[in-house]
């Protein structure tokens, strides 16, 4: 056993779980205490995750803060966790956005508040494990366990009448895709006798086995991203989820599929990954163009951002399967950027919904006149969403396009069209909401963002600018892990 309790990764992992057990002891009637305690636990978890970044050695591709112990002796299964440059920032993004989720729910959740907060702390624990476990079986367990609290968040605390249908749709779509992954996992275990990721990376499966296993993993990861045509559940889940649910869904859950491709599909099944690259590129281009055009037809603000997420994740999958350093690093940066930008936009939509109880775009116009601070934030985040220079999305998209240009110039051309469509729906969105004449007939009063809402949005804005102006502070941490991934692929 190699277990150090003062390991920052152990502290980051266990803090939300300990918080759950303590929160269970607090009476449900003491809502203020429940809120404050959950907030302090989430802040403490974030501070521990910052220690990971501070102590992280960017000059190596090895897993750091590793811990291993035997958890299932009969099958010789070990519980192993550790992080590299790929997983580091996903953990940081998770711990940051959980704070935003708790703060944005401060006054909007009126029923079963303690249970709601417990769901988010459990979700935080599960997501940290997803990004840190180095065992295929453990990854699968946590990967699927995330569905349970998310199902409850959408189905119990959703904002509209179709929330139950949306929750079941989300649950069933993702579960069915993952059943194939379970069969593949069992096949791998019976072939190799292990589920240790660091051993599986160096086992050469036959080409036929790789194709079968890759497709099984693809079925699970493609639903999570989601790729066309597995995206049907996403707009409905976003439309029905509470604001915090949409933040965690867009900010973190969609990244689990991309992370799965990077951590498992590419290094374990390199031959199959190369074989299916044209297939992935085709689906990605369809996602970019179809989702961008569909976005222009939406009237629900949440569905607009949901479809734009499908388009952005199309760029991510192009970058991942470009199989070069610009593509890998660009896709990771783009996922991190999308996690910040889409979360910020959903938070802005939540600001409007909390005040006016509608997300239908036709009711909004000229808000810059009565909500100037909100208007500035919404304008900035919308520009970040379209990939404006100086924002985080710009760097990620440029790296992805550079990577695709090395492979197929036609692919790059059509992907660039997606950026043009993205600019079109982004400009249309903020022009419709922020500018124009104020529609006084629909609302009796207007209120700009509160101090609490300001402090939720400003850290996201700062990070988006930081990533856009000084991307090397992130790329340097990612680089050696990305190089190591490409070396694993090249050893076929």
UniProtKB/Swiss-Prot annotation:
<dbReference type="GO" id="GO:0015990">
    <property type="term" value="P:electron transport coupled proton transport"/>
</dbReference>
<comment type="function">
    <text>Core subunit of the mitochondrial membrane respiratory chain NADH dehydrogenase (Complex I) that is believed to belong to the minimal assembly required for catalysis. Complex I functions in the transfer of electrons from NADH to the respiratory chain. The immediate electron acceptor for the enzyme is believed to be ubiquinone.</text>
</comment>
<keyword id="KW-0679">Respiratory chain</keyword>
<keyword id="KW-0812">Transmembrane</keyword>
<protein>
    <recommendedName>
        <fullName>NADH-ubiquinone oxidoreductase chain 4</fullName>
        <ecNumber>7.1.1.2</ecNumber>
    </recommendedName>
</protein>
<feature type="transmembrane region" description="Helical">
    <location>
        <begin position="136"/>
        <end position="156"/>
    </location>
</feature>
<feature type="transmembrane region" description="Helical">
    <location>
        <begin position="304"/>
        <end position="324"/>
    </location>
</feature>
<dbReference type="GO" id="GO:0048039">
    <property type="term" value="F:ubiquinone binding"/>
</dbReference>
<dbReference type="InterPro" id="IPR010227">
    <property type="entry name" value="NADH_Q_OxRdtase_chainM/4"/>
</dbReference>
<feature type="transmembrane region" description="Helical">
    <location>
        <begin position="410"/>
        <end position="430"/>
    </location>
</feature>
<dbReference type="GO" id="GO:0031966">
    <property type="term" value="C:mitochondrial membrane"/>
</dbReference>
<feature type="transmembrane region" description="Helical">
    <location>
        <begin position="36"/>
        <end position="56"/>
    </location>
</feature>
<keyword id="KW-0830">Ubiquinone</keyword>
<feature type="transmembrane region" description="Helical">
    <location>
        <begin position="9"/>
        <end position="29"/>
    </location>
</feature>
<dbReference type="InterPro" id="IPR001750">
    <property type="entry name" value="ND/Mrp_TM"/>
</dbReference>
<keyword id="KW-0813">Transport</keyword>
<feature type="transmembrane region" description="Helical">
    <location>
        <begin position="332"/>
        <end position="352"/>
    </location>
</feature>
<dbReference type="InterPro" id="IPR003918">
    <property type="entry name" value="NADH_UbQ_OxRdtase"/>
</dbReference>
<feature type="transmembrane region" description="Helical">
    <location>
        <begin position="211"/>
        <end position="231"/>
    </location>
</feature>
<keyword id="KW-1278">Translocase</keyword>
<dbReference type="GO" id="GO:0042773">
    <property type="term" value="P:ATP synthesis coupled electron transport"/>
</dbReference>
<dbReference type="GO" id="GO:0008137">
    <property type="term" value="F:NADH dehydrogenase (ubiquinone) activity"/>
</dbReference>
<feature type="transmembrane region" description="Helical">
    <location>
        <begin position="242"/>
        <end position="262"/>
    </location>
</feature>
<feature type="transmembrane region" description="Helical">
    <location>
        <begin position="170"/>
        <end position="190"/>
    </location>
</feature>
<feature type="transmembrane region" description="Helical">
    <location>
        <begin position="86"/>
        <end position="106"/>
    </location>
</feature>
<feature type="transmembrane region" description="Helical">
    <location>
        <begin position="269"/>
        <end position="289"/>
    </location>
</feature>
<keyword id="KW-0496">Mitochondrion</keyword>
<feature type="transmembrane region" description="Helical">
    <location>
        <begin position="454"/>
        <end position="474"/>
    </location>
</feature>
<feature type="transmembrane region" description="Helical">
    <location>
        <begin position="63"/>
        <end position="83"/>
    </location>
</feature>
<keyword id="KW-1133">Transmembrane helix</keyword>
<dbReference type="Pfam" id="PF00361">
    <property type="entry name" value="Proton_antipo_M"/>
</dbReference>
<comment type="similarity">
    <text>Belongs to the complex I subunit 4 family.</text>
</comment>
<keyword id="KW-0520">NAD</keyword>
<keyword id="KW-0472">Membrane</keyword>
<feature type="transmembrane region" description="Helical">
    <location>
        <begin position="115"/>
        <end position="135"/>
    </location>
</feature>
<keyword id="KW-0249">Electron transport</keyword>
<feature type="transmembrane region" description="Helical">
    <location>
        <begin position="370"/>
        <end position="390"/>
    </location>
</feature>
């Amino acid at each position: 056993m190699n277990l150090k309790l003062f390991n920052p990764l152990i502290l980051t992992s266990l803090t939300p779980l300990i918080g759950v057990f303590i929160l269970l002891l607090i009476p449900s009637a003491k809502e203020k205490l429940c809120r404050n305690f959950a907030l302090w636990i989430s802040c403490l978890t974030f501070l521990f995750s910052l220690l990971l970044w501070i102590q992280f050695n960017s000059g190596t591709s090895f897993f750091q803060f590793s811990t291993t112990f035997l958890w299932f002796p009969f099958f010789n299964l070990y519980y192993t966790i550790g992080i590299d440059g790929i997983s580091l920032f996903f953990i940081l993004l998770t711990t940051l956005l959980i704070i935003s989720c708790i703060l944005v729910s401060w006054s909007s959740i009126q029923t079963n508040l303690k249970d709601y907060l417990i769901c988010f702390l459990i979700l935080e624990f599960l997501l940290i494990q997803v990004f840190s476990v180095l065992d295929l079986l453990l990854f699968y367990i946590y990967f699927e366990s995330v569905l349970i609290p998310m199902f409850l968040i959408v189905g119990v605390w959703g904002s509209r009448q179709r929330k139950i249908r949306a929750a079941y749709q989300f649950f069933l779509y993702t579960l069915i895709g993952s059943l194939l992954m379970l069969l593949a996992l069992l096949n791998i275990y019976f072939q190799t006798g292990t589920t240790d990721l660091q051993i599986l990376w160096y086992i050469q499966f036959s080409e036929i086995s790789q194709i079968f296993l890759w497709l099984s993993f693809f079925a699970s990861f493609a639903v999570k991203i989601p790729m066309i045509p597995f995206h049907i559940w996403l707009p409905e889940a976003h439309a029905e989820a509470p604001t915090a649910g949409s933040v965690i869904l867009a900010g973190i859950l969609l990244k689990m599929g991309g992370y799965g491709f990077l951590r498992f599909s590419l290094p374990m099944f390199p031959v199959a990954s190369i074989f299916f690259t044209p297939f992935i590129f085709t689906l990605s281009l369809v996602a970019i163009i179809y989702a961008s055009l569909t976005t222009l037809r939406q009237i629900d603000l949440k569905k607009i951002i949901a479809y734009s997420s499908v388009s952005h994740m199309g760029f991510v999958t192009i970058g991942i399967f470009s199989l070069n350093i610009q593509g890998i690093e660009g896709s990771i940066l783009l996922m991190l950027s999308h996690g910040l930008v889409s979360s910020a936009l959903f938070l802005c939509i939540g600001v409007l919904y909390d005040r006016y109880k509608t997300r239908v775009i036709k009711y909004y116009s000229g808000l810059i006149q009565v909500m100037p601070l909100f208007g500035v934030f919404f304008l900035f985040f919308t520009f970040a969403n379209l990939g404006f220079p100086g924002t985080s999305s710009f760097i990620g998209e440029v790296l992805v396009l550079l990577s695709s240009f090395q492979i197929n110039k036609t692919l790059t051309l059509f992907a660039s069209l997606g950026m043009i469509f993205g600019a079109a729906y982004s400009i249309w969105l903020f022009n419709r909401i922020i500018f124009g004449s104020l529609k006084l007939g629909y609302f009796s009063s207007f209120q700009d963002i509160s101090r609490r809402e300001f402090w939720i949005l400003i850290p996201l804005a700062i990070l988006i600018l930081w990533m856009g102006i000084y991307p090397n502070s992130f790329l340097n941490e990612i680089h050696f892990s990305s190089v190591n991934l490409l070396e694993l692929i090249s050893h076929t």
